[in-house]
């Protein structure tokens, strides 16, 4: 059984609790179903005014799991909710019955569905324009049953039954007959009722059938009609004998049933008690049941006075006769609880009664006072008023259920309690023996699976006494196994609950497997039998006890092994090692054969077979090519022969492809390439000393090696001496053709069908093992599932590597046992892996001693599917608008409760446009402003003479797509709004307000006459063709109203025009639209320059007045307004007599075309270039002669520097490396410079240590000089602080990297202390004449430049320049077979980077963070916002199919990091890419920086980078990206430590690329809006803006990264340059840069679409939507999250200037030509992005990749 009853009773258990607690549910029909009708036409409003709205309504009738049933969203919209309920409830009912639904395929199962209302379907079919093919089946009653038959592929009877309220029991009767006649073996019976519209309420209300309060008061004195109810129930029926045979749960037995018709009674709708009595007597007679043995009758009992009277009379006559008052027949009705479910009510009564039989209790019937016209005692019946026990009375409990329909059909069912005892498991839930078992779950989607796992965990946790075998039996044999699967291995209820909860949380811990089966893969796995190396002491020992088939197989080999080797497999397994290599060879065969038999006993079979070396023997047996006993004898003799080779050889695996390894070895005989173990690994074999020596030599050349545990050199020259013995032993074999595909690893062709004869087995031992080739062949043949049959997985990794190398990512590789791991658990976990990937398992062999239990079968993933047809949504349109009226005033409604509010509604499309001629503006058909103003005029027509004031034309009204239009007047306020007609019923559909205004009654035009002659006399005559030409240039493609320009005179401020109107024949005489249109249109010429190419449109009007009759010929006088002369005009319109009949005051125009700026990726990516230093570039710079240089630093640097300076005539003072003591105030008596000159550290000093030391040296020096200067009173000689660095520019020597931080510090000091700072000078290795050149700089360059480089060519200065694009390369792409490491990976920025890298192909991520995440079991309960954000970020990545490892590491600890990233610890492929994004911000002005704060900031960036540099030296990675900052260039205050750390990264990148490698880049980011370390963006970016920098969005940042990665550069600055404030000079480094947006337009490499190339269309569309949202946010200065994609842009605040800026941005980003009017037709982000998507050209039919943009949109 299954059910849904109001409000949310979604299971029989919940329904039962509801009933026994005597509850009821009644409420109002939901607004969504009521209001479209109640607010419709006046007739509809009147009809519904007194209609009962109350009843029992389900909370959710729109929700449906369409994906589960393979139904598209489009079709689901057209699916009657009753069909949806029937599908879901049929699935649930079958699960309750223990019948896996998918096993019914091709059976004669019948489906019977009772329903008598299809409100939803009727309503959809009324919407003729939108009725499509899906409505054929989706809107019908027959579809309720047929849909289930179609989905489950059932071939028995399938029908809808409509006998009104008797329908459900009629359907049950028909199903029972079909079962008894043998027509069908199983029947699904449903009864349903959904009230999609109030239409039937109106009819029933008019018939007097409904209770005013919506309650059914069955058999109550106050009964006054019935309350309608929604709900559905489904039953599964079987013949009792079949149910017993199949061990199915039997809830109750149907002893009989009957269906009759009352014929011609007092009226078709009138109940007939006599007919009911006759039907009951006939039914019980045919069933052979005495009515006196019936304990309880679930009556129809609707609560109508007449119906209840007739029914109780009939019941009393049949069931009450002869009964004692102490033992009456009990009567009840479920309708007071859940309402009258009409066509489904009979099933509701049956479910209630079955539950009562099962629980031996009868729930109460809700009533206040039983009917007083019934003598209950005398009649032998009693109404159940409270919960009543149901004793058995020595016979089966029996009950009847009655229904009768409004058309006269009467039906009844006789129920009896189940004769089958309640299911009890033979398994003991608490035996104390913890045996692991497998528990599979499945669903149609991942979300559904996780939800189901959570529900199952709760179910088991709440029923701890349920035997686990019964749980397993239910999940394995009583459920269908769907595509999204999980399987859990558990040995206790507690462990099962814990692991199910992990599945619910999306985690795959120990004992948990989850995957989705893939269509098109082979049904069965390829069984792979590995060779030497899987053995371990104790292997198979547990299986001997737990798996009888394993023990039997090993015992069957005893005789052969004892004869040949003197020991048996059982002895070897029981006793354990140590074993010789030869021992292992024979034992490997025995164990593999035993394990293969175990897999077969689990119901598996091989799809193909591969053997590896000795594993080929077992492979041949399993494939049917060899006899088991013959093969066992051969394996023993082979092992005995190999015994002679023990201890003479060795084998080692190396990290090279087979061919490359063989090539390196050349013709050597002492070492050979023996095994092709994987695409990038080979096993070498040969003389022990030679093999070990080769391994050592190759390891020194960075080839990884690993010793193989074997002292026999298999597959090498060593085995030549036993090859003859092997061939001789193999002659006893009788090879046969295999029965399953058998791939060879001994021959060059893996598909060779060569017989497994003696020659083959000699080759098997001597020739190289071509394992990689065999796996590749199997994969090429379509196999995607592989099972390694071994005691430990030794080749599974090689299989995985081979598949990844082929680009196959949907494969799975399972093992069998694992060393030192519980063998039963290991076996089950691997079985879980195979099952979850689609291998067929014979579940009948599992959980054989369990019984069916009530585990949840599905947790539906509901999404709303609902259509409000336009005929319904527009029911209030009334007459609609009259296009000839030139207005959009439609049907009028007065809103209830708001007498001052009036609404007119209509529909606008091309056929109903309120103007006679096409009015195209730049390609868009637009409703003229005149029609909208005329609409308002018509809305206030009843007020008499009026003025429209404060008209705001917010956004133009495009005609296409068709729109629903509403005009609303509330008091004096007017507004006109629309929404797209096809979205009118969609959730989130937004109304767009186009125009607002106010009305002032009693106002007429100022009147008077227009002195046309005086005006003519002062205005020169203009060209009549000028207007047409000008409007054509503007993009006006036609006038909305036909008029001719007869005269035109104008100057720069005034214009006179005479227009002749051509009224259309149907035009209404009261329309002013043609007059206002002519006046507004021609007046635009006053504000438009003569050569204008922009479109000027009306934006607002202060006041419009009119009076009299609209003229056919008008004179329009337009003058620039004195109040706002630039874009505002006052207009007066006169008739032929010269009388002013219309005035337009304060008509403002707006240009819809403007030059805007959009930033392209190419405008954001910059690099450092070096220009010759020219003192003339710094006119006005301080020219203070330097008389003395104070040198601070190490003697190793200051002594030689002093010598060079002194040789140039400079006085030098050396104070050592302690500025606190060395810098004394007396030294500052002469003008001079303080030069910090650290030495290059020795090779024994780490660069990170030295970087910290020299940074602190410079900081202390600046602080000390500032202190001394602050203490000096009066004028003091100028002193500037300089620093000297060694080859930071190129950093060819690693020691130079330590000086890198000084550049960043220098720039920040220049900002914090411009009065103190001189500059930084970098001395290259080829620079000469340093003394004189440095003196010149100290004298003439102080404070002018951040950094000056002295080279052999001269002095050069750093400038930012847009990246050199001459060497275009390939954007960053991650190898799917590698791992990407991200430090700072759990920060907001790190997670964004991770998601972006996934888009670039990354499939395995290691996220390093300082702070650990909680244990996964605690994740659901985490409430801390920051931790929650991190957890959600990881889960989001995993949901994309990415493997994520989160490591809590100190990135500065090389030992900790190297240990964590070791392949064996990480369990992932090698790291191929690194993004170092870790960082700490601790802002402080240079004066306030202390050593502790400096170290804190330097540590993660500097020390962390050096750890990674050493772990991944240049050439080891595909990419190494360092996250730096460009804030240093803007001299941002407080960022001294941060700039120093980032400058170190920049120098490290140069050093890593100094050789032949170019994979490293340091990215100097500007702030990212809303991410990572830019949380202080408001303050930081205020300062940055003033210095020419602006933040970027994440979209812009990633676009820039992707663009810049194509060009080789050690350092790239990602920044947007903006104009600096007036009188603020640009900093030197920015002087060569254009402001962002200064570009000639889009080129191929500038387009945002380049970031989308190769993406599936849907993903590209989603990215475009996000990008358009970003662009809108940019022009609004919003965060993107504040931009609602379906909200009109004008509502968000986008004005005409922003519109143009947005349009230009989009044109440049997408290479499209967008019309200036684009936002009129596409006024939301959703619509705009859809237009952009549709305007791009896509490759492919349905899911093509983005190719290139079209030329125009």
From Swiss-Prot:
| SMART domains hit by this protein | PKS_AT (SM00827), PKS_DH (SM00826), PKS_KR (SM00822), PKS_KS (SM00825), PKS_PP (SM00823), PKS_PP_betabranch (SM01294)
Q: Give me the Gene Ontology terms describing cellular component.
A: cytoplasm; plasma membrane
GO terms classed as biological process:
antibiotic biosynthetic process; DIM/DIP cell wall layer assembly; fatty acid biosynthetic process; secondary metabolite biosynthetic process
Which GO molecular-function terms appear in the entry?
fatty acid synthase activity; phosphopantetheine binding
SUPFAM superfamilies attached here? ACP-like, FabD/lysophospholipase-like, NAD(P)-binding Rossmann-fold domains, Probable ACP-binding domain of malonyl-CoA ACP transacylase, Thiolase-like
Q: Which residues form a coiled coil?
A: none
Q: Which UniProt keywords apply?
A: Antibiotic biosynthesis, NADP, Phosphopantetheine, Phosphoprotein, Transferase
Q: Which Pfam families match?
A: Acyl_transf_1, KAsynt_C_assoc, ketoacyl-synt, Ketoacyl-synt_C, KR, PKS_DH_N, PP-binding, PS-DH
Q: Where is this region: N-terminal hotdog fold?
A: 886-1006
Look up keyword Glycoprotein and say if it applies: no
Instruction: Outline the extent of the PKS/mFAS DH domain.
Output: 886-1158
Q: What is its EC number?
A: 2.3.1.237
Transmembrane domains' residue ranges: none
The residues covered by the Carrier domain are 1659-1736
Going by the entry's taxonomy, the superkingdom of the source organism is recorded as Bacteria
Quote the catalytic activity from the record.
5 malonyl-CoA + acetyl-CoA + 2 NADPH + 6 H(+) = 2-hydroxy-5-methyl-1-naphthoate + 5 CO2 + 2 NADP(+) + 6 CoA + 3 H2O
Pathway, per record: Antibiotic biosynthesis
In the record, which positions carry O-(pantetheine 4'-phosphoryl)serine? 1696
* Family annotation (InterPro entries): Ac_transferase_dom_sf, ACP-like_sf, Acyl_transferase_dom, Acyl_Trfase/lysoPLipase, Ketoacyl_synth_C, Ketoacyl_synth_N, Malonyl_transacylase_ACP-bd, NAD(P)-bd_dom_sf
Catalytic positions are 165, 300, 340, 919, 1077
Q: What Gene3D superfamilies does this protein map onto?
A: 3.30.70.3290, 3.40.47.10, ACP-like, Malonyl-Coenzyme A Acyl Carrier Protein, domain 2, NAD(P)-binding Rossmann-like Domain, Polyketide synthase dehydratase
Tell me the function of this protein. Iterative type I polyketide synthase that catalyzes the synthesis of the naphthoic acid moiety during the biosynthesis of the neocarzinostatin (NCS) chromophore.
Protein name as it appears in the record: Neocarzinostatin naphthoate synthase
> Which organism is this protein's natural source?
Streptomyces carzinostaticus
């Amino acid at each position: 059984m299954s059910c849904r009853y109001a409000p949310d009773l979604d299971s029989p258990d919940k329904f039962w609790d509801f009933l026994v607690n005597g509850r009821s549910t009644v409420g109002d029909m939901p607004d969504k179903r009521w209001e479209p009708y109640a607010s419709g036409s006046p007739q509809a409003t009147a009809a519904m005014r007194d209609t009962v709205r109350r009843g029992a309504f389900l909370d959710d009738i729109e929700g449906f799991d369409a994906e589960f049933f393979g139904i598209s969203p489009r079709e689901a919209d057209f699916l009657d909710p009753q069909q949806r309920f029937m599908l879901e409830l049929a699935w649930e009912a079958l699960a309750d019955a223990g019948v896996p639904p998918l096993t019914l395929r091709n059976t004669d199962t019948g489906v019977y569905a009772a329903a008598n209302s299809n409100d939803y379907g009727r309503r959809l079919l009324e919407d003729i324009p939108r009725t499509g093919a899906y409505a054929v089946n989706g809107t019908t009653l027959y579809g309720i049953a047929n849909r289930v038959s179609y989905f489950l592929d059932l071939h028995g009877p399938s029908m809808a039954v409509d006998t009104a309220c008797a329908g459900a029991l009629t359907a049950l009767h028909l199903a029972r007959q079909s079962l008894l006649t043998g027509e069908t073996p199983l029947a699904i019976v449903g009864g349903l009722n959904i009230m999609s519209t109030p239409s039937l309420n109106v009819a029933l209300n008019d018939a007097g059938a409904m209770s005013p309060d919506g309650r059914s008061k069955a058999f109550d004195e106050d009964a006054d009609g019935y309350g309608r109810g929604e709900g559905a129930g489904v039953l599964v029926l079987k013949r009792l004998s079949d149910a017993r045979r199949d061990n199915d749960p039997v809830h109750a037995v149907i002893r009989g049933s009957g269906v009759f018709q009352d014929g011609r009674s007092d009226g078709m709708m009138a109940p007939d008690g006599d007919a009911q009595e006759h039907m009951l007597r006939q039914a019980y007679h045919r069933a052979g049941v005495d009515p006196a043995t019936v304990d309880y009758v679930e009556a129809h009992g609707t609560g109508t006075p007449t119906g209840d009277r007739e029914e109780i009379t009939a019941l009393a006559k049949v069931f009450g006769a002869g009964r004692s008052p102490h033992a009456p027949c009990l009567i009840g009705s479920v309708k007071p609880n859940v309402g009258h479910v009409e066509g489904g009510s009979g099933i509701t009564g049956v479910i209630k009664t079955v539950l009562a039989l099962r629980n031996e209790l009868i729930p109460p019937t809700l009533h206040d006072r039983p009917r007083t016209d019934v003598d209950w005692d005398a009649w032998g019946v009693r109404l159940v008023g409270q919960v009543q026990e149901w004793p058995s009375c020595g016979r089966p409990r029996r009950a009847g259920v009655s229904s009768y329909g409004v058309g006269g059909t009467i039906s009844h069912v006789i129920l009896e309690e189940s004769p089958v005892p309640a299911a009890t498991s033979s398994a003991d839930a608490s035996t104390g023996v913890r045996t692991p078992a497998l528990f599979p779950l499945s669903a149609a989607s991942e979300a559904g699976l996780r939800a189901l796992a959570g529900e199952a965990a709760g179910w088991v946790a709440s029923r701890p006494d349920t035997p686990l075998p019964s749980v397993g039996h239910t999940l394995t044999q009583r459920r269908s196994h769907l595509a999204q699967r999980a399987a859990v291995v558990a040995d206790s209820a507690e462990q099962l609950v814990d692991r199910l909860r992990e599945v619910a949380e999306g985690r795959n811990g120990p004992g948990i497997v989850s995957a989705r089966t893939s269509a098109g893969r082979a049904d069965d796995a390829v069984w792979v039998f590995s060779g030497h190396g899987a053995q371990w002491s104790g292997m198979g020992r547990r299986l001997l006890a737990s798996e009888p088939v394993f023990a039997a197989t090993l015992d069957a080999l005893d005789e052969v092994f004892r004869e040949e080797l003197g020991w048996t497999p059982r002895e070897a397994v029981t006793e354990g090692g140590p074993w010789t290599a030869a021992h292992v060879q024979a034992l490997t065969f025995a164990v593999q054969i035993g394990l293969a038999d175990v897999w077969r006993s689990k119901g598996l079979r091989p799809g193909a077979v591969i053997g590896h070396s000795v594993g080929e023997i077992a492979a041949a047996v399993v494939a049917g090519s060899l006899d088991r006993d013959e093969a066992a004898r051969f394996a023993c003799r082979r092992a005995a022969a190999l015994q002679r080779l023990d201890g003479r050889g060795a084998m080692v695996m190396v990290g090279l492809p087979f061919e490359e390894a063989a090539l390196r070895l050349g013709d050597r005989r002492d070492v050979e390439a023996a095994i092709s173990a994987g695409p990038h690994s080979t096993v070498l074999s040969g003389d022990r000393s030679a093999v070990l020596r080769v391994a050592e030599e190759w390891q020194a050349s960075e080839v990884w090696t690993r010793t193989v545990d074997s002292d026999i050199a298999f597959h090498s020259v060593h085995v030549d001496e036993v090859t003859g013995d092997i061939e001789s032993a193999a002659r006893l074999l009788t090879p046969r053709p295999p029965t399953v595909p058998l791939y060879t690893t001994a021959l060059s062709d893996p598909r060779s069908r060569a017989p497994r004869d003696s020659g083959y087995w000699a080759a098997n031992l001597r020739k190289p093992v071509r394992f990689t080739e065999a796996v590749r062949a199997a994969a090429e043949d379509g196999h995607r599932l592989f099972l390694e049959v071994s005691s430990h997985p030794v080749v599974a990794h090689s299989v995985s590597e081979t598949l990844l190398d082929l680009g196959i990512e949907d494969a799975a590789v399972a093992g069998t046992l694992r060393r030192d791991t519980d063998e039963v658990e290991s076996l089950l976990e691997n079985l879980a892996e195979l099952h979850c990937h689609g291998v067929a398992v014979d579940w009948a062999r599992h959980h054989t001693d369990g019984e069916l239990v009530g585990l949840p079968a599905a947790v539906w993933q509901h999404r709303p599917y609902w259509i409000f047809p336009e005929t319904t949504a527009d029911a209030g349109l009334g007459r609609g608008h009259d296009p000839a009226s030139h207005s959009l005033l439609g049907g009028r409604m007065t809103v209830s409760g708001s007498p001052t509010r009036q609404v007119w509604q209509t529909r606008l499309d091309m056929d109903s446009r309120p103007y006679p001629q096409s009015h195209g503006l730049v390609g868009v058909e637009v409703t003229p402003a005149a029609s909208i103003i005329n609409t308002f005029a018509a809305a206030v027509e009843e007020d008499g003479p009026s003025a429209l004031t404060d008209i705001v034309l917010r956004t133009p009204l495009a005609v296409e797509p068709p729109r629903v239009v509403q005009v609303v007047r509330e008091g004096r306020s007017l507004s006109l709004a629309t929404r797209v007609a096809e979205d009118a019923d969609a959730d989130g559909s937004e109304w767009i307000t186009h125009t607002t205004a106010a009305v002032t009654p009693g106002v007429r035009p100022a009147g008077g006459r227009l002195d046309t002659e005086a005006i003519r006399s002062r205005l020169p005559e203009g060209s009549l063709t000028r207007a047409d030409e000008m409007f054509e240039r503007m993009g006006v493609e036609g006038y909305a109203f036909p008029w001719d320009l007869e005269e035109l005179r104008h100057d720069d401020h005034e214009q006179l025009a005479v227009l002749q109107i051509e009224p259309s024949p149907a035009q209404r005489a009261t329309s002013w639209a043609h007059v206002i249109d002519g006046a507004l249109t021609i007046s635009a010429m006053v504000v438009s320059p003569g050569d204008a190419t922009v479109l000027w449109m009306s934006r607002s009007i202060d006041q419009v007045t009119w009076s009299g009759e609209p003229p056919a010929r008008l004179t329009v006088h337009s003058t620039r307004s004195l109040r706002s002369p630039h874009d505002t005009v006052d207009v007066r319109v006169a008739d032929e007599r010269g009388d002013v009949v219309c005035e337009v005051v304060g008509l403002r125009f707006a240009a819809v075309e403007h030059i805007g700026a959009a930033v392209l990726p190419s405008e954001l990516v910059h690099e450092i270039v070096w220009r010759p230093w020219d003192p003339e570039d710094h006119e006005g710079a301080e020219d203070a002669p330097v008389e003395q240089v104070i040198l601070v630093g190490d003697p190793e640097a200051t002594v030689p520097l002093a010598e060079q300076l002194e040789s140039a005539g400079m006085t030098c003072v050396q104070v050592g490396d302690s500025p606190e003591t060395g810098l004394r105030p007396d030294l500052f008596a002469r003008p001079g410079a303080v030069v910090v000159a650290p030495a290059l550290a020795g090779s024994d000093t780490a660069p990170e240590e030295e970087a910290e030391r020299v940074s602190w040296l410079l900081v202390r020096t600046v602080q000390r000089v500032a202190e001394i200067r602050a203490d000096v009173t009066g004028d003091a000689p100028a002193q500037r602080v300089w620093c000297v660095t060694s080859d930071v520019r190129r950093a060819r020597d690693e020691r130079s990297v330590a000086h890198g931080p000084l550049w960043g510090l220098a720039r920040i000091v220049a900002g914090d202390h411009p009065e103190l700072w001189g500059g930084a000078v970098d001395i290259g290795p080829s620079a000469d004449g340093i003394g004189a050149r440095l003196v010149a700089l100290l004298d003439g360059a102080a404070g002018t430049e951040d950094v000056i480089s002295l080279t052999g060519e001269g002095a050069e200065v750093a400038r930012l320049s847009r990246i050199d694009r001459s060497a275009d390369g390939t954007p960053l792409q991650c190898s799917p077979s590698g791992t990407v490491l991200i430090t700072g990976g759990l920060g907001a920025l790190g997670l964004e980077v991770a998601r972006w890298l996934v888009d670039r192909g990354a499939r395995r991520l290691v996220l390093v963070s300082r702070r650990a995440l909680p244990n996964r079991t605690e994740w659901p309960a985490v409430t801390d916002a920051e931790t929650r954000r991190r957890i959600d970020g990881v889960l989001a990545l995993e949901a994309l199919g990415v493997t994520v490892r989160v490591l809590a590491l100190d990135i500065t600890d090389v030992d900790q990091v190297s240990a964590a990233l070791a392949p064996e610890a990480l369990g992932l492929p090698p790291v191929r890419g690194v993004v170092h994004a870790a960082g700490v911000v601790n802002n402080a002005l240079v004066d306030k920086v202390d050593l502790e704060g400096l170290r804190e900031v330097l540590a993660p960036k500097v020390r962390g980078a050096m750890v990674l540099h050493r772990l991944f030296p240049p050439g080891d990675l595909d990419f190494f990206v360092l996250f730096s900052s460009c804030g240093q260039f803007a001299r941002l205050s407080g960022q001294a430590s941060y700039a120093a750390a980032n400058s170190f990264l920049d120098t490290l990148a140069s050093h890593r690329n100094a050789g032949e490698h170019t994979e490293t880049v340091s990215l100097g980011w500007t702030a990212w809006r809303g991410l990572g370390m830019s949380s202080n963006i408001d303050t930081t970016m205020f300062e940055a803006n003033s210095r020419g920098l602006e933040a970027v969005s994440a979209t812009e940042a990633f676009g820039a990264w992707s663009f810049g990665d194509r060009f080789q550069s050690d350092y790239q600055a990602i920044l947007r340059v903006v104009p600096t404030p007036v009188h603020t000079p640009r900093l030197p480094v920015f002087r060569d840069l254009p402001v962002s947006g200064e570009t000639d337009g889009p080129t191929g490499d500038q387009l945002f679409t380049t970031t989308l190339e190769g993406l599936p269309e849907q993903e590209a569309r989603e990215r475009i939507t996000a990008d358009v949202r970003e662009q809108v946010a940019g022009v609004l200065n919003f965060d993107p999250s504040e931009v609602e994609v379906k909200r009109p842009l004008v509502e968000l605040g986008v004005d005409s200037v922003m519109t143009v800026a947005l349009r230009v941005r989009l044109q440049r980003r997408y290479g499209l030509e967008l019309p200036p009017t684009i936002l009129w037709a596409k006024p939301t982000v959703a619509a705009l992005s859809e237009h952009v998507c549709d305007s791009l050209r896509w490759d492919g039919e349905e899911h093509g990749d983005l190719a290139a943009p079209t030329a125009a949109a």
